[in-house]
Swiss-Prot record:
Transcription factor required to direct islet cell differentiation during endocrine pancreas development. Specifically required for the differentiation of 4 of the 5 islet cell types and for the production of insulin. Not required for pancreatic PP (polypeptide-producing) cells differentiation. Acts downstream of NEUROG3 and regulates the transcription factors involved in beta-cell maturation and function, thereby restricting the expression of the beta-cell differentiation and specification genes, and thus the beta-cell fate choice. Disulfide bonds: none annotated. Keywords: Developmental protein, Diabetes mellitus, Differentiation, Disease variant, DNA-binding, Nucleus, Transcription, Transcription regulation. Belongs to the RFX family. Residues 124-199 bind DNA. One of its GO terms (biological process) is type B pancreatic cell differentiation. This is DNA-binding protein RFX6. PROSITE patterns: RFX_DBD. Changing V506G: In MTCHRS; inhibits the transactivation of the insulin and beta-cell L-type calcium channel genes. One of its GO terms (cellular component) is chromatin. Expressed in pancreas. Expressed in pancreatic beta-cells (insulin-positive cells) and alpha-cells (glucagon-positive cells) (at protein level). Specifically expressed in pancreas, small intestine and colon. Expressed in endocrine cells in the islets. Interacts with RFX3.
Length: 928
C-alpha cells in the first residue's frame, strides 16, 4: 500500500489539466467521487485505470461503480496520513491524466444530452411554428416534411432525430394531425393530412410550383403518387360557405335599420348556400329557380335596401366569396380527370349563368344589376377557361406519357429553325416606337421555345409544363411590369402577341416538314396557350378582388373583419348564430322545423279584427285568380328573422337548424309547445276572442284550438299533443296531392261563410270552414260530394313572408319531389314510392276497413303517400290520385323517433335544404 499516497498525489496534481469551467468541473468531480464515497466504506476507495499494474486490490475492498464507463474503474484507498508528492511515475501520470480526461468528456456528454434534447425539441417546435400551419384538406408527404427537418438540423448543427421521433414531435405541435396513405397500388406514400406549408416559409417555393399564379400551380405536390380516380362532386358534399361580412361591423350611410341589414345578409347567405348545395349535387337547372324566387320574391320591407350603395357593394363581396367557393367545388385544383358529363354540365352552367342572373334581377334597381353583372362575367370567364384547360390537360396527359409520341415530337421540333422564325418576329415590332428595355424581344421567344424543347426531351409531365409556364409568365410579364412601371395589361398583350406569332410559325414549319407528330404538338400548344391565358386572367381577377377588398375595408369598422371575409376558407361544419331582435317576440321567429299546423282564417264576422286581412274568393280557376287588398300575415307580428321554407320542403333540415326541432338546442331558436301554434298571428289577437270560442266552435266542440295551445285540457274526442315535429293526423284517411292543390273535381271554393260555430253531427258537415291554400290565399271548403277536404298550410308558407306573390303558378309549388335538392348533411337519394316501402301488396287500400279510433292520432305525418285510403266514417269519398302528396297520415307509419334514428325518415327521402323558399319544384300533379 506504499504507492497509494503517490497515486493519490499524482491524481491531485493532474486535476487542473482539463480546462473546464468551474461549474462543469465541480459537477464532474461530484459525480466522479460522490457516488463512490456513498457506496464504499470511507477507508477503501480506489482510483486506477483499468488494467493498471501495481494497484493492490483487496477482495472485499474492491468494487465497480455502475455509473462509470467500462474503461474506467474507481479504486482508491484513503488513509489519515499526509499525501506525498516526492515519488512520481511519469507513465502513471500520463495514464491517469488520459483516463480522467476521457471520463470527464464522457460524463459531460451524458449529463448534457438531456438538456440538449430538450433544447432541440424546443427549437424544432419553433421551426414547425414558423414554417407550417394547420390546413384542413391538405396532404403533405411525410418524406418531404422529414427532408425539411434534416435540412433544418444541418443548418442549425443539430443531431437529427429519427423519423419516428420526429413524428412524435410534430404531433406535439399539431395534435390533430392524421396520416393517410395516398397513391396508386405499389406506389403509395404516407402523407400528413391537415398540415400545409406557410407561404412565408423558405420551403414553400421548393415544394409548390411557382408562386401560385393559378389554382393548378401547386398540383405537382398533390398529384405525387398519381391519382387514377375520376373527380366527383360528391367528394365536396358538406362544403359550407365561409362567413359573410357582418352587419355589426358595417358603416352605414343614412338611416338604415341594422336589424334589416342583418336579416338581408343572412337571407342572402342562405340563398348562396342553397346555390352551392345544388351545384354540389349537380342540380344546375334548379339554381335558376332559386335565383328567380329570391330576387323576385324579395319582401317589401327589404326592397329599399337594394338601392343603398353600401348594401349593393356588400352583395358584390358576397358574390365574390360564393364564386370562389363554387370554382373550388366544381373544378379540382389537383387536375384530376373529370367525367365528360360533368364537364358538359359545368360548361352549360357557365353559359347560362349570366342570363339567369339578369332575368332574376328584372324590375330591381339598375345600380344593383350594374354592379353584379361584371362580377358574374369574370366568374363565367374563369369557369370556362379552367374547364377548357382541364379538358386539354387530361387529353394531353396520355400523349406526354407515350414515349414514342414524345420522341417523335422531339425529332420533329429539332428540324425547326427557331432562329429564322425569330428574325421574322422582328416584323411585329418594326413599327413600334416603344424603346423600353423590358420589352419582350425575339431573343426571348427563341429562349422560351428552346426551354420547351428541353422539357420534351426530359419527358416532362403536365405539372412540369405548368411550373415552367408559371416561371415564364412571372419573369417575363409580371416582374418586368412591376420594375418598369408598365401596366400589366400592356405587358401581357405584348407577350401574348409574340408568343402566338412564334407558335404559329413553328406549326407552319411542322406542316411544311410533314411532321408525323403534328397533331400531338398541336395539342400541347393548345394546352400551353390555354394555361397562359388562364394565368393572365387570374392576375387581372386578383386585381379586381383587391378592389373589392379595398371597398369592403372602407365600409367596415374593423379591418380584420373585412380581411377575414376574403381569407376565410369554406368549411364542412356550420353553426349559425341566430341573433334575434330584442323587440321581436318569439312568435315572430318562424319555426324552421317540420311542425305541421292547420291554419284557419277567421271570417269577417268573427271577433278579432282579422276580417280585412283575409279575403274569400269565389269558385273558379285558382291559377288566374287575382289577389287584391291582400295583407301579409308576417307583417302582423313583425318581420320574420329568417327566410321562409318552401311549402314543398317543409320537412327538410337545413344548414341552420340541422335537423328536426326535437334535436335543436334551446339557444338556437324558440321551441313551440304545440303543433297547433300559429306563429304568424300575434298574441294580442287572442284576447279579442270570446272565452266561449277558445275552441273556435264552442267549449264543447270536438275540435281543438286552432290558433294556439290551451293551458287547460279541452273537452272532446281530439286531445292535444305537444310532441315536436308532430301534426294532428287523420287515422284512416290518406290525402292525395289534390288535397293541397287549388283544383278539385267539383266546386273547389265555397263563398258561403260558416253559419254557426256549434258542433256538427257529421264530420263531413262540421268541416264547413275555409282553409288557407298552400299556393295562395285561396280558401277551400268541403261541402259537396266532389269538393276538397281542406288544405294544410305549413308555417313557412311563402305568402306569410313574401306577401301576395302570385307570379308563380301552383303547379310549380307542389311538383314532383323526386329530383329534390340534397343539403350539405343528408345523402343523395331519390324518393321511392310510398307503396313500394310501406304497402307493396296494396293491403292498406281497403275502403271498408273498420275505423279504429278518433280522427286525430299521435303518429307522425309522412312526407309522401300514394293511394289514398278512405275512412269509413266519411260520407264523401276523396278523389283517388296517383300523384304524391306531402302530408298524408296513417297509424301504420313508424314513429318519428324511429325514422330519425334509423335514417329511413321521410325527411331524408325528401332531403334537407337551407331555409329558402323554393317555389319551383317541377311539374304539377293531375288536375293542376
Amino acid at each position: 500500500m506504499a504507492k497509494v499516497p503517490e497515486l493519490e498525489d499524482t491524481f491531485l496534481q493532474a486535476q487542473p489539466a482539463p480546462q473546464l469551467s468551474p461549474g462543469i468541473q465541480e459537477d464532474c468531480c461530484v459525480q466522479l467521487l460522490g457516488k463512490g464515497l456513498l457506496v464504499y466504506p470511507e477507508e477503501t476507495v480506489y482510483l486506477a485505470a483499468e488494467g493498471q499494474p501495481g494497484g493492490e486490490q483487496g477482495g472485499g475492498e474492491k468494487g465497480e461503480d455502475p455509473e462509470l464507463p467500462g474503461a474506467v474503474k474507481s479504486e482508491m484507498h484513503l488513509n489519515n496520513g499526509n499525501f506525498s508528492s516526492e515519488e512520481e511515475d511519469a507513465d502513471n501520470h500520463d495514464s491517469k491524466t488520459k483516463a480522467a480526461d476521457q471520463y470527464l468528456s464522457q460524463k459531460k456528454t451524458i449529463t448534457q444530452i438531456v438538456k440538449d434534447k430538450k433544447k432541440q425539441t424546443q427549437l424544432t417546435l419553433q421551426w414547425l411554428e414558423e414554417n407550417y400551419i394547420v390546413c384542413e384538406g391538405v396532404c403533405l408527404p411525410r418524406c418531404i416534411l422529414y427532408a425539411h427537418y434534416l435540412d433544418f438540423c444541418r443548418k442549425e448543427k443539430l443531431e437529427p432525430a429519427c423519423a419516428a421521433t420526429f413524428g412524435k414531435t410534430i404531433r406535439q405541435k399539431f395534435p390533430l394531425l392524421t396520416t393517410r396513405r395516398l397513391g396508386t397500388r405499389g406506389h403509395s406514400k404516407y402523407h400528413y393530412y391537415g398540415i400545409g406549408i406557410k407561404e412565408s416559409s423558405a420551403y414553400y417555393h421548393s415544394v409548390y410550383s411557382g408562386k401560385g399564379l393559378t389554382r393548378f400551380s401547386g398540383s405537382k405536390l398533390k398529384n405525387e403518387g398519381g391519382f387514377t380516380r375520376k373527380y366527383s362532386l360528391s367528394s365536396k358534399t358538406g362544403t359550407l360557405l365561409p362567413e359573410f361580412p357582418s352587419a355589426q361591423h358595417l358603416v352605414y350611410q343614412g338611416c338604415i335599420s341594422k336589424d334589416k341589414v342583418d336579416t338581408l345578409i343572412m337571407m342572402y347567405k342562405t340563398h348562396c348556400q342553397c346555390i352551392l348545395d345544388n351545384a354540389i349535387n349537380g342540380n344546375f337547372e334548379e339554381i335558376q329557380h332559386f335565383l328567380l324566387h329570391f330576387w323576385q320574391g324579395m319582401p317589401d320591407h327589404l326592397l329599399p335596401l337594394l338601392e343603398n350603395p353600401v348594401i349593393i357593394d356588400i352583395f358584390c363581396v358576397c358574390d365574390s366569396i360564393l364564386y370562389k367557393v363554387l370554382t373550388d367545388v366544381l373544378i379540382p385544383a389537383t387536375m384530376q380527370e373529370m367525367p365528360e358529363s360533368l364537364l358538359a354540365d359545368i360548361r352549360n352552367f357557365a353559359k347560362n349563368w349570366e342570363q339567369w342572373v339578369v332575368s332574376s334581377l328584372e324590375n330591381l334597381p339598375e345600380a344593383l344589376t350594374d354592379k353584379k353583372i361584371p362580377i358574374v362575367r369574370r366568374f363565367v370567364s374563369s369557369l370556362k377557361r379552367q374547364t377548357s384547360f382541364l379538358h386539354l390537360a387530361q387529353i394531353a396527359r396520355p400523349a406526354l406519357f407515350d414515349q414514342h409520341v414524345v420522341n417523335s415530337m422531339v425529332s420533329d421540333i429539332e428540324r425547326v429553325d427557331l432562329n429564322s422564325i425569330g428574325s421574322q418576329a422582328l416584323l411585329t415590332i418594326s413599327g413600334s416606337t416603344d424603346t423600353e428595355s423590358g420589352i419582350y424581344t425575339e431573343h426571348d421567344s427563341i429562349t422560351v421555345f428552346q426551354e420547351l424543347k428541353d422539357l420534351l426531351k426530359k419527358n416532362a409531365t403536365v405539372e412540369a409544363f405548368i411550373e415552367w409556364l408559371d416561371t415564364v409568365v412571372e419573369q417575363r410579364v409580371i416582374k418586368t411590369s412591376k420594375q418598369n412601371g408598365r401596366s400589366l395589361k400592356k405587358r401581357a398583350q405584348d407577350f401574348l402577341l409574340k408568343w402566338s406569332f412564334f407558335g404559329a410559325r413553328v406549326m407552319h414549319n411542322l406542316t411544311l416538314n410533314n411532321a408525323s407528330s403534328f397533331g400531338s404538338f398541336h395539342l400541347i400548344r393548345m394546352l400551353l396557350d390555354e394555361y397562359i391565358l388562364l394565368a393572365m386572367e387570374t392576375q387581372f381577377n386578383n386585381d379586381k378582388e383587391q378592389e373589392l377588398q379595398n371597398l369592403l375595408d372602407k365600409y367596415m369598422k374593423n379591418s380584420d373583419a373585412s380581411k377575414a371575409a376574403f381569407t376565410a376558407s369554406p368549411s364542412s361544419c356550420f353553426l349559425a348564430n341566430r341573433n334575434k331582435g330584442s323587440m321581436v317576440s318569439s312568435d315572430a321567429v318562424k319555426n324552421e322545423s317540420h311542425v305541421e299546423t292547420t291554419y284557419l282564417p277567421l271570417p269577417s264576422s268573427q271577433p278579432g279584427g282579422l276580417g280585412p286581412a283575409l279575403h274569400q274568393f269565389p269558385a273558379g280557376n285558382t291559377d288566374n285568380m287575382p289577389l287584391t287588398g291582400q295583407m301579409e300575415l308576417s307583417q302582423i307580428a313583425g318581420h320574420l328573422m329568417t327566410p321562409p321554407i318552401s311549402p314543398a320542403m317543409a320537412s327538410r333540415g337545413s344548414v341552420i337548424n340541422q335537423g328536426p326541432m326535437a334535436g335543436r338546442p334551446p339557444s338556437v331558436g324558440p321551441v313551440l309547445s304545440a303543433p297547433s301554434h300559429c306563429s304568424t298571428y300575434p298574441e294580442p289577437i287572442y284576447p279579442t276572442l270570446p272565452q266561449a270560442n277558445h275552441d273556435f266552435y264552442s267549449t264543447s266542440s270536438n275540435y281543438q284550438t286552432v290558433f294556439r295551445a290551451q293551458p287547460h285540457s279541452t273537452s272532446g274526442l281530439y286531445p292535444h299533443h305537444t310532441e315536436h315535429g308532430r301534426c294532428m293526423a287523420w287515422t284512416e284517411q290518406q290525402l292525395s296531392r289534390d288535397f293541397f292543390s287549388g283544383s278539385c273535381a267539383g266546386s273547389p271554393y265555397n263563398s258561403r261563410p260558416p253559419s254557426s260555430y256549434g258542433p256538427s253531427l257529421q264530420a263531413q258537415d262540421s268541416h264547413n270552414m275555409q282553409f288557407l291554400n298552400t299556393g295562395s290565399f285561396n280558401f277551400l271548403s268541403n261541402t259537396g260530394a266532389a269538393s276538397c277536404q281542406g288544405a294544410t298550410l305549413p308555417p313557412n308558407s311563402p305568402n306569410g313572408y313574401y306577401g301576395s306573390n302570385i307570379n308563380y303558378p301552383e303547379s310549380h309549388r307542389l311538383g314532383s319531389m323526386v329530383n329534390q335538392h340534397v343539403s350539405v348533411i343528408s345523402s343523395i337519394r331519390s324518393l321511392p314510392p310510398y307503396s313500394d316501402i310501406h304497402d307493396p301488396l296494396n293491403i292498406l287500400d281497403d275502403s271498408g276497413r273498420k275505423q279504429t279510433s278518433s280522427f286525430y292520432t299521435d303518429t307522425s305525418s309522412p312526407v309522401a303517400c300514394r293511394t289514398p285510403v278512405l275512412a269509413s266514417s266519411l260520407q264523401t269519398p276523396i278523389p283517388s290520385s296517383s300523384s304524391q302528396c306531402m302530408y298524408g297520415t296513417s297509424n301504420q307509419y313508424p314513429a318519428q323517433e324511429t325514422l330519425d334514428s334509423h335514417g329511413t325518415s321521410s325527411r331524408e327521402m325528401v332531403s334537407s335544404l337551407p331555409p329558402i323558399n323554393t317555389v319551383f319544384m317541377g311539374t304539377a300533379a293531375g288536375g293542376t
